[in-house]
């Protein structure tokens, strides 16, 4: 059973990491800024993983744009998602730029032989420390319009879309990287606002995966959504009819600590309905989980999980140099970089 996504410690693949990646529980890999020096180095690292690990691995990254962009030097400066509606007055231009950003991000990552970037963020509003300008908008209708275009751009390249952080991380001030946030709003309000983007995009068949939040919604359930069968099985699967893959958010984050030690976090998230579990920045915990985590599942559930995983691999391979010579890439690079520069200037002025 392959369910874990783990990470690497540096810019080179070590022998002990090859052994971890070949463990039967490991389904994939997530890359971070510490794994990146320049384009040639990251291409070599990914090529090493593909060649030396003797099984298919889902290689992933957080390359959303704005402040969450793991690879920078030599890549397009993707604008923060908030910038589209904030800086561009024409709705058609907003949507066009969102499409360009989704296409550009997916094209650059696919050219590196990366399968998936965990995007887009579907959280409403900008007040949450962990979300901020990663959110498209504070109003669900506008957010849905822009997210649709971003995803359509990704899909043009053949990359799957992951909506996060279900059912919505935008209305808590605390950062789940550092603590477990609590959202005390009424259930009716969450369903009337935060869930709408997920609901709409699922109905349109635009989400291939969903990542739940490490947030406790106190008026709905006493567990974080990432470890809650109410949110994942009852709401996401049954009420919204979602049939794609469910990723846990990083179980190494402090926000997941509510569920116990690392093995307990994996156990609870899996039982709650997650298909794939991320465990990052905790190398000792990875070894502990691989040694002690013994998930029990029926053959049918394993087949369903593997089918969902298989659908997330990239649909095509793009040559890096060919991409950079394309007219579309060059035009997008110029426009998106300019918008991000305008956004940084705007934020500096605003502060």
From Swiss-Prot:
Q: Which GO terms describe its cellular component?
A: cytoplasm
The UniProt annotation places substrate binding at: 62, 70, 134, 164-165
* Reaction(s) catalysed by this chain's protein: Hydrolysis of terminal non-reducing N-acetyl-D-hexosamine residues in N-acetyl-beta-D-hexosaminides
In what pathway does it function?
Answer: Cell wall biogenesis; peptidoglycan recycling
Report the locations given in the UniProt record. Answer: Cytoplasm
Q: Please give one Pfam family short name.
A: Glyco_hydro_3
Question: What does the UniProt function comment say about this protein?
Answer: Plays a role in peptidoglycan recycling by cleaving the terminal beta-1,4-linked N-acetylglucosamine (GlcNAc) from peptide-linked peptidoglycan fragments, giving rise to free GlcNAc, anhydro-N-acetylmuramic acid and anhydro-N-acetylmuramic acid-linked peptides.
What this protein is called in its record is Beta-hexosaminidase
